Amino acid sequence: MRSLLLWIAVVVCLLCSVAAVVQSGSSDGFGKPRDTETAISFLEYKLMAPSVPMIPLTLIHGADSKGAVCLDGTLPGYHLDRGFGSGANSWLIQLEGGGWCNNHRSCVYRKTSRRGSSKFMEKALAFTGILSNRSEENPDFFNWNRIKLRYCDGASFSGDSQDESSQLFYRGQRIWQVAMEEFLSLGMKQANQALLSGCSAGGLASILHCDEFRELLPSSTKVKCLSDAGMFLDSVDVSGGHSLRNMFQGVVTVQNLQKDLSSTCTNHLDPTSCFFPQNLVSDIKTPMFLLNTAYDSWQIQESLAPPTADPGGIWKACKSDHSRCNSSQIQFFQEFRNQMLFAVNSFSNSDQNGLYINSCFAHCQTERQDTWFAQDSPQLNGKRVAESVGDWYFDRAKNVKAIDCPYPCDTTCHNLIFE
């Protein structure tokens, strides 16, 4: 098993987004922010080959006239690498992840980072994994039009309100709409194939917007959706509380998301429950592929054992490196895996849907070359992630659904270790 070392001390210096501001040794809402998303993003950057082409940032000019702006009022942006050959009329839209802001302070903080302002976004990004333009790295989508839509609203491209006093613009839904208008004008309206994808908070966004994406395109266009590490569960944390539910409740309340959530869900559940994908995926009409690790690193760090639920630090070593967990802690993770499998059970009954749940301690596998398609990539039933997604999208195989055996049986994992 290959383990990947991720140096949190270095990452803190590069901190530029907040999943939810959590304090160390502070109870009043102030202190050093922790950010697992940035830590994982830093690891992905370190894994990229130096020869990877850089794709420039394009701002959506005129978006501000429609109120489609980042948290700080700046223009939203994207990176586009044009398709070629047989893929010239095929489109892949990758929605960026990066946590959420769940209160006034964390949303204000994001205004000073790329997660809330295009002023701080990288001027160019490396396209790897599912975004790569090389057939040997991305066999099925390498020659498609590949777009990465940047994330700067803090609510998974949802919400349409603002905080006048702090000049905070919660305009994720408008950003989604103007971005889609832009892509349609660039040629996506003539697409013969399209895939809406996303990682983490972007994976949740792919779930939230999947059917909406389908409706944008002609019925003759083949449209499917992929959610990578987007199955955030409404789980009990190590203290018996509901850390992620509390966070999501803040997101829904602060950004006034109620009106943007699925009415099919809100007709029988509260708005916060309808931000959890486990209550949404079975009602999606468009074919959807769920890719997730059974022991999602972000959820372990921020939902199951955040510092607020573990003030004594009993879980600190275990959540940083699973090899340092005791048997009861591993059992807690096994119960989380069982919840994951239960959450996708109804979804998996549909023949049109795809599933890939591997028993790894990781987060986001589509944009990392080592986990998407490499010689030693993780495998399930002899298939790497890219191969399974391709089999499902192009209907090369029936019933593309793979669920791994429980930890520690999978020796192909690329596990994340935080030190």
UniProtKB/Swiss-Prot annotation:
Record: glycosylation sites: N133, N326
BP-aspect Gene Ontology terms: cell wall organization
Subcellular location: Secreted, Cell wall
Cleavable signal peptide: 1-20
Disruption outcome: No visible phenotype under normal growth conditions.
TM helices/strands, residue ranges: none
UniProt GO MF annotations: hydrolase activity
Keywords: Cell wall, Cell wall biogenesis/degradation, Glycoprotein, Hydrolase, Secreted, Signal
InterPro entries cross-referenced by the UniProt entry: PAE/NOTUM
Source organism, top-level taxon: Eukaryota
One Pfam family named in its UniProt record: PAE
GO cellular component: extracellular region
Active site: S200 (charge relay system), D296 (charge relay system), H363 (charge relay system)
EC number(s) recorded for this UniProt protein: 3.1.1.-
Classification via PANTHER family: NOTUM-RELATED, PECTIN ACETYLESTERASE 6
Protein task: Hydrolyzes acetyl esters in homogalacturonan regions of pectin. In type I primary cell wall, galacturonic acid residues of pectin can be acetylated at the O-2 and O-3 positions. Decreasing the degree of acetylation of pectin gels in vitro alters their physical properties.
Sequence similarity: Belongs to the pectinacetylesterase family.
Protein name: Pectin acetylesterase 6
Organism: Arabidopsis thaliana (Mouse-ear cress)
Native organism taxonomy: Eukaryota, Viridiplantae, Streptophyta, Embryophyta, Tracheophyta
